[in-house]
Amino acid sequence: SHLTKKLLYLDEEVICLDNYFTGRKSNVHSYLNNPNFELIRHDVTEPIQLEVDKIWHLACPASPIHYQFNPIKTTKTSFMGTYNMLGLAKRVGAKILLASTSEVYGNPEEHPQKETYHGSVNTIGLRSCYDEGKRLAETLCSDYQRMHDVDIRIMRIFNTYGPYMLSLIHI
């Protein structure tokens, strides 16, 4: 919802896809009457046909309590969600930004990590559904960029917490 607020402030048109697995409609309630905002209940593991010029791909449960609740869905969201968003970007010529995570480094052996550091990962641990899903999403992005010349950016987000996020008290 912070990104939506900023994009609407910049007078951008925003189409928000959400399946409400970790989000709440109330997070974007104040934008529902904005003519530049459209909310679609949709799971990105399913393809969607839209006409857009930018895609901000943020879909994936990022909290351990969420991604461990259904680890297969978490991996599927990272893989199929990214695959579907990349397919959309390719079809309409949109730029895409993938929200990845510092978790792709696994249990790093160097601090701080450089962009060239490949990490020290556990592919079968309890957190692997999230970590490896994001690594796979980054791989898909790199392959789409090389093979289809899709304009892609990847941001690796480290620890975050703030307004609109669910706390353990609410779960």
State the predicted function of each range:
Residues 169-171:
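Conserved small/polar residues in nucleotide/adenosyl-binding loops
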